[in-house]
Amino acid sequence: MHVKGLAKLAVLAALVIGGGIYAAVPVATFAESKTLALQIALDRRGFSCNTIDGQWGRRSQVALATYCAVNGYAVPPSPELARDILFPRERNLFRTETVTQREHDALVRIPATPEGKASLKAMGYETIMEMYAERGHLTEGALRRLNPGVAWPNPPVGTVVKIPDFINGQDAKSPKVSVMRVTLSRFEITAFDEMGRLVALFPCSIAADKAKLPPEGELQVTTLIPNPDYTYTPERVSRGGRIVRRIFPPGPNNPVGTSWMGLTLPGYGIHGTPKPERIGCAESHGCFRLANWNAVRLRKMCETGTSVVIEK
């Protein structure tokens, strides 16, 4: 099916489920939630709701509807049925990890000033909670619910923590992308392979200032950089003052996160973020911002020259 046809099909499928939120079904523990299991299964296949939280909202609805549209399935009427019908044999949803001294030693405090940020060796995680939430593609609230007895935000060395298992998930099998479509009105990026098949969906943030939005049209990927640094340039300088640029070191709390894809439009790119739970709105400075794990995954699916279509 043509790329645009598939994109429209995904939108139509999303409309089928409407804007309602399904009522939560009581479960013995949060880890047994079928909504949580469904979000994990969809994420593994490249259809992301952004941060996994076990709640059935718009982003989860769109991820499910798009996955169903691509695969020719009817959209089940509830997340519980979707889990049972689409992924009845999904295994190894979770893994456990043990908090180490090395992880504690790697924590940093991110200063408020550009000078302070530039002085760091790395813009790492500020808490163990932030570290493990990102590792499991979770909201911090969901991480707490999965591990209710843990002393958050910085549990001691030796604490065992349960998170969704993405190390051995299907994300390692992601296909190569030929075209990406950035749909500004829906705050999302869809990725298509060389046959025009929709293979991934990622929520994104766009510029809050409409004047900074790139024009509609086609761009290309020019650079792919893991763990980028960031050049900070002040927006305002006092009259007669000198512009002092600062280089912020790499790390998950770097303003562009852990991945950068530069585009043929100078100054614009697709990148990560230090605040994944805020993805999906108008708040960036002009670029397209994804959760770090989605930015990394998308970068690995692309190459220089990959087409990027900007559309309303």
Residue ranges of predicted features:
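Solvent-exposed, polar/charged alpha-helical surfaces in well-ordered, non-transmembrane soluble domains
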Residues: 36, 40, 58-66, 127-134, ...
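Bacterial N-terminal signal peptides that target proteins for export
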Residues: 2-10
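Sec-exported extracytoplasmic/periplasmic mature domains
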Residues: 43-47, 65-73, 87, 134-138, ...
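Secretory/export targeting leaders with adjacent low-complexity proregions
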Residues: 121-201
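Primarily a LysM-type cell-wall glycan-binding module
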Residues: 29-61, 99-137
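C-terminal soluble interaction/assembly domains
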Residues: 248-259, 264-312
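Extracellular LysM carbohydrate-binding repeats and other cell-envelope/extracellular binding modules
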Residues: 58-104, 144-175, 179
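Gly/Pro-biased beta-strand-loop elements
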Residues: 167, 173-273
